[in-house]
Amino acid sequence: VLSVLGVLVIYGALSSLRLLQAAHHLERGETAITTVRAELTTADLTESKATPELHVAEAEFAEAHNEIHSSWLDPLHVVPYVGRQVDSLNALSGAAATVTQLGSTALSRVQSLLSAPHHTPAERAVVVRNLASVIDGLNSRVERISLGPSKALLPIIATKRNTFVTDLNKLRAGLNKGQAAADAIATLLDNDQRYLIFTANNAEMRDGSGMFLQAGTVTTDDGRLTLGGFHSTAELASPTPLTPISGDLAARWGALSPNADYRNLGLSPQFELNAPVAAAMWKAQTGQKVDGVLTVDVAALQDLLAVTGPVSAGGVTIDAADVQHYLFVTQYVGVTGNAATNETRRQELGLLAEGVFRAIQGGGVSLTHLASALDQAVDGRHILAWSADPTTEADWVTAGASGQLGPDDVLLGTINKGVNKLDPYQQVTARLRLSPHGEDTDVQISATMHNNTPPGLPPYTVGGATPASPVDYYTGALALDLPKSAGDVTERGGTGVVAIGADGPSNVL
């Protein structure tokens, strides 16, 4: 009996040692992954900077899995409760090793694709399509990963498993987003598309986007983007509706004629409601049918200029450092209500967008840095996209570029109605307070808006053209978009409610 007990003690000690070694490997692997996640940007991930840490994580997770998967521990699998813990550790370590190995392999393929020649539009279109294929393959394999048992686990193992589930879900969401973006862009570049494109100015805001001040078209052919020239939306405004509107858009915003003036389409932040109306308006005015609609604002141009470097527009060279000051201040110097000078000023935003497009088309732009800039612009609603094709629209939605608010999203925006360019100087602060009451929760959002307009701005910027909007006076509204599930919405402290009710997938106040 003592001999048997001795053997069991020795076996238990050696088994504990193997599990302890596995725990150390898992910890070192987690540290490497944390470094990758915390310190590296999208561009870093595709420029080999993540590769060393990923290899470290891959090796550590593989060692941990080898320790736990060892035949030495097989007897533990049949021990009640203990076997479940070992099974869970085995599955988690194997999943971690698989994910890092897949990620490392996929990154190597991405780096190989991006290092291949892509100087021409056609070559870049092929790269995008191949990137979509790589992400699709990685995504399908990640979806098949099993994490083992989830119940009756030790607290420390349950916590590790829950963390892994959270991280794996984030990875899957990121892969879905990346694949959808690559598919949508590849479709745009490959299939002779024509999109209506707006340039928006954040100096005069609508809810969740700048006012659409210039409109034009961009067509694609074998990867090449061709801009058809921009037109001032002020000049395109119609005295009568260009197309009928219905539903929430008509009920909330119909009185301001968004179907007659492109500048009022952004009153609703729901781009999937606005874009089809814009496409119908454009067809009514020009006879051109478009396959989709894009918007690009000043912040997006700044992100893109950081990649392309300086561009020339209207005889002026502009870079990422000065584009906001130029478009928010400098371009308005000397501008009056004179139609000729005003039209010249309005054209500058479109000319700048054309310059950026030319720089991207010309080659020599890092695709990794371009992808990072586009990702940043999309996350901030600075680039919005809609497609008339349901499959491509679904890709834009998954990529986060559709401007569609989710069922739990809250958006606080400003709507400028003061005939001025003072939005960059408005400081909006908000506080959220939650008060649970049984199954319900009272939500209070306190918002304050401070006008910090500095002295010395050009007269055209500060307004004063109408009695209702004196110089330096901000006339407009705060728009609060809430989940559809929010009920009993009330307000106090404002000067009145101009719109309340359903607005697409949200409620607006």
Predicted regions: what they are:
Residues 7, 11-509:
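Non-catalytic, solvent-exposed segments at the cell envelope interface
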Residues 1-5:
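N-terminal Sec-pathway targeting helices
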